[in-house]
């Protein structure tokens, strides 16, 4: 079995499985199963349309792959089909000044991250509710005290975050937590756990804030883009 013969690439509500053409089919199935198992509970609740490319599959092989995804991932698999579209080749771009002073912090925060599946959850996460995902998680709403959100990638809350949050749940210390009002009862990135001070300074207007790891500690900063 060749390691790295299977790659998952995804976007919102979609997953593409890239398989090495020369790899044995049974080995590919085993690698896919291992990838799903290592993701734990984070596939659960997702609704995915799946495509594959790189290796031609018979109808029987395609059926077995569909059953594996359906039975092992915990996600709802809407469809499975071969990706017949040719990958888009990026056009060459001339090197030009990039105004690094304005994007320096953004480059720092996102260094080393790979694009992955992003799940959008619309609505308030209430007390006792858990929303989790293997990838980036965007909450369009609030996270109330007693609510919990967990993701292997970034966690972004388009509202008040007053519950528990865990980003980088698979050990990714490059993950971020971002919220319009960041007041979690517990904040965790990878294996680093913290909580905000009991008396957090508040003003009449909320500002987006982000949390990240630097030198083994969690830092929380206001996000004020340069004008």
From Swiss-Prot:
Disulfide bonds: none annotated. The keyword Translocase does not apply. One of its GO terms (biological process) is regulation of cell septum assembly. Keywords: Cell cycle, Cell division, Septation. It comes from the Bacteria. InterPro entries: CAP/MinC_C, MinC, MinC_C_sf, MinC_N_1, Septum_form_inhib_MinC_C. Gene3D superfamilies: 2.160.20.70, 3.30.160.540. Interacts with MinD and FtsZ. This is Probable septum site-determining protein MinC. It comes from Acetivibrio thermocellus (strain ATCC 27405 / DSM 1237 / JCM 9322 / NBRC 103400 / NCIMB 10682 / NRRL B-4536 / VPI 7372) (Clostridium thermocellum). The gene is minC.
């Amino acid at each position: 079995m060749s390691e790295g013969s299977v790659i998952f690439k995804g976007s919102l509500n979609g997953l593409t499985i890239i398989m090495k053409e020369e790899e044995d089919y049974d080995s590919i199935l085993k690698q896919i199963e291992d990838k799903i198992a290592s993701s734990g509970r984070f596939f659960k609740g997702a609704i995915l349309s799946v495509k594959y490319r790189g290796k031609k599959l018979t109808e029987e092989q395609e059926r077995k792959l569909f059953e594996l995804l359906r039975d092992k991932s915990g996600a709802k698999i809407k469809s499975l089909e071969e990706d017949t579209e040719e990958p888009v080749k990026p056009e060459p771009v001339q090197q030009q000044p990039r105004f690094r002073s304005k994007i320096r912090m953004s480059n720092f925060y996102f260094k080393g991250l790979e694009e992955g599946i992003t799940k959008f959850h619309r609505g308030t996460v209430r007390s006792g509710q858990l929303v989790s995902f293997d990838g980036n998680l965007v909450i369009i709403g609030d996270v109330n005290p007693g609510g919990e959100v967990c993701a292997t990638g970034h966690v972004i809350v388009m509202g008040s975050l007053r519950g528990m949050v865990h980003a980088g749940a698979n050990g990714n210390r490059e993950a971020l937590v971002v919220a319009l009002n960041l007041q979690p009862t517990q904040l965790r990135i990878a294996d680093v756990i913290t909580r905000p001070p009991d008396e957090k300074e508040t003003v009449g207007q909320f500002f987006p804030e982000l949390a990240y790891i630097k030198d083994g500690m969690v830092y929380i900063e206001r996000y004020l883009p340069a004008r």
